[in-house]
Amino acid sequence: MPIRAKYVHTNLIAREWKRLVRFYCEVFGCEPKGPERDMSGAWLDNVTSLPNAHLTGVHLRLPGYGDDGPTLEIFGYDQLIESDLPTANRCGLAHIAFAVEHVDHALQALIADGGSEVGSIATTKVEGVGTLRVVYARDPEGNIVELQEWS
């Protein structure tokens, strides 16, 4: 029997977390939820297995959800480890997705606020679901964001 669980957040570690928070608020209408976090101490070192870990950031309420919905947690560590730019076929977390009214407009807003395109807009029919217009893009820090429009 499965454990009782509730999905609560997705975490993005950012080089400039305040800039990334602004991006998700301005482009997607996310809103800060709760206080700004400033965390450190033995408990965080134990959880992360990183000595002297210190992180700051905030949770963002996602569009389409109320106060009890999942959040996008955007944090920055004092010490970061750089990695290659994410690709769509990389093992592990690959992208986050937003359903939007108009993919074209959403993509332009994303680009205007510092994001970029990964591929081009495509349309396909998904049997039993509908028609999907979709594109992959990147936020200002290179994380892949899927924009999808269903009809």
Regions found by a protein language model. Name each.
Residues 13-68, 128-130:
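Core segments of cupin and vicinal oxygen chelate
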Residues 66-76, 81, 86:
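Helix-adjacent hinge/juxtasegments
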Residues 91-95:
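Eukaryotic phosphotyrosine signaling hubs
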